Structures are given as C-alpha cells and as structure tokens.
Amino acid sequence: MSDSPRPELVVDGLPGKKRPRWIELATSADHKDLGRILLCGALGFLFIALVELLLMRLQLAIPENTFLSPVTFNRMLSLCGASAIFLFAIPLALGLFYYLAPLQIGSRGTALPRLGQTGVALWVAGATVLYAGYLFTPSEAGVNPLAPLTELAFLANNGVDAWATATGLCTLGFVFIAIDLLTTLRNLRAPGMAWRRVPVFAWAATVSCWLLLVIGPVLLAALTMLMIDRNYDGIFFADGSGGAPLLWQHLSWIFYSGSYALILIFAFGAIAEIVSSFAGKPLFNRGVVMGSLVAIAVLGTLAWMQNMLTAPIGLGWMYFAMLMSLALIVPVGLIFFNLISTLVGGALRMRAPLLFAVGALSAISIGLGAEICHSMVAAAWELKNTTDSTAATHFALVGGAVFGGFAALH
C-alpha cells in the first residue's frame, strides 16, 4: 500500500480566483446564460439591421439617387434580410423560450444542455460568417436568393457560398436548440403538470420547436443542394440541365413561411400571458388558444405557395395555397377574440408590457389583413413582388417579433 499523499480536493481553476464573467457566460451550459446570449445577440443585430434598412430607405427616398451603388444596395438588402430572420427574429423567440420555458415547467435546467450550447455556438458562428463575408465578397442575390440567379454563371464570386454557409450554421443551431428545449418540455415537467396545465408560453415553445424540426431540415437540404450546384457541378437548380429552379422556391418558402408562423406563435404565446397577468383574470378559453397555436403552425407552413402565386405553378396549387392562407384567419381570429375577451371586464394595469402587447396585436392585424388580399390569386398577380406586399409582411413581422418581443422582454 502506497504512502504517497492524495489530494484532498480537486477544484476547477485557481483557488480564490474567479473567472471573468464573459468567460463564464461563453462556456456555460445553463439555459439562462444561453438565453441571455441569444437575446443580447438578437437585439444587437436588430440595431444593425435597422441601420442597414435606414441606409436603403435613404437611397430610395430620392429618384435617381447615387447614395448607394446598385451593387452595394443589393449586398445590403441581402445582409439586412438575413439579419432580420436568422439573427434577430428567430433567435429572439428562441432566447425567450430557452430562458423562460424551463422555469415555467419547474425544471432546474434543460435535458440536453451540451446540445443547446452547441446550437448557440453554431448560431454565433453563422453570424460571424455572414458579417465576415461582408468584409470580403457579400451576397448580392437578395433576401431569398432564387435560382438560377445563384448559379455560377450569374454570380461567380463566393458571396452566395458565404450566405449559404452562414444561414446553414444558424439553421442547424436552431434545430439543436429546438431538440434540447422540446426534450426538456416533454420529460422534465414538474410532477402533476399535464400538457393541459402547461403555461401558454411554454406551450407556444413546444409548438415552435416541433415546427423548427420540420422546416429546419428542409432549408438545410436546400442549402446543401445549392452548395453542390455551385461547387461540385450539381444540377439540382440548373435550368436547362435537367434541374428545376422552381424546386428552390418550394424548399426555401417552406422554411420562410414556417418561420413567419413561428414568430406569430411566439408573439401570441407571450401576449396571452401578458394579457392574463395585466387584466387580473384567467385567459378566456385557454384550450382554444392552445389549439389555435397548433393550427397556425400547420396552416402557416402549408401556405408556403402563397408566396409563389406569380411563379409557374399549376392553378390547382394556387387555389390550395389560397385556401390555406384564408383558413389561417380562423385560428388567428379565435386568438384575437379570446385575448379581447380576457381584457374586457378585467382590472387593467396599463404598463409597458400590456401597451407593447396591444401594439403588437394592432400591427399583426393590419399585416394579416393585407396578407388576406395578397393570398387571393387574382390580386396576387398584381400585388406580389411590390412594395405593398413587402409592407404587409413587415407589418406582421414587426408586430410579432419587435412589439411582441419587447412585450415579452418587459
């Protein structure tokens, strides 16, 4: 038997010396710290996207303006669109879900913390690649780069490759976070907390995670095919070589339509909690609201071809997309009715969260009302790809992501 001394205590780091806070935050697997990273990053990229948007509006303010060159404008548009969706709206929703949902169900942490940490790291890497690409050769193909514009014959630089890599890393990170959060909500609920007892915001997180698990791999598959086309002589989207440029539109719009629905689900989940709290009464028809969130996820994703009514698709598919878009009115209307019914007769406390929530409902109603017009086939042929269509989308997204997000943050 050896008489050599054994250590009494093994410590992580030097005794009496605490690591800096930023190192603790960067290496932590705690869901609250990871949620803070997503939230702080999302708000930072919101500011950057607003600056880019302001510069583009200054260019468009005067006819024949030379403030921005056409190439610079296209690059800024591509960067602003990617920042708004991949670096602000979805991370803001996931950050609040990741921070609050485990606490709402009585869990001390998440089920797969390292997977969630990897997801956040992938998102940070994607954001770095996107803006590092802007320093060299940024993408010039727009918010949703459509084939065959993305082929090497039209854009021979590496801008589209950088965009595809950045958005792919972000999307993969979102999928990892969704798996971790969904596993937590499924397995780590407090004893006796059945699904019908789960808070509405935690239920919105569950629906959003399922939605991300559906739409995320679709975009990853599309980005993989795009990279094969550009770098390994693939023909997935190559027109005239047996490829189908329209395939990119289908795959990408499935993701973007699902993301649109995800942002609305996040906003309605947060607003439902806020309205109930600041009205001083339980949420009216709580089960109907929870069911409507599921319906928004399903119908909002199935309506992806509503963005393609000016593309060469069959008339039957156009009517299918129109019907899915019009059917979306039902769950959204039910949620509005129940939220208003909760406010009526309540002891309202007009604080910042409730004011943001009411502003979000107003903006969402205007945006979705305009989207109803754009979902009609006859009107879409005239209004699609115009500033009116862009305004309708931005009304709903600003109402959901910005006002709804600020309401939840308060």
Which positions does each model-derived feature cover?
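Membrane-embedded and interfacial regions of multi-pass energy-transducing membrane proteins
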Residues: S2-H410
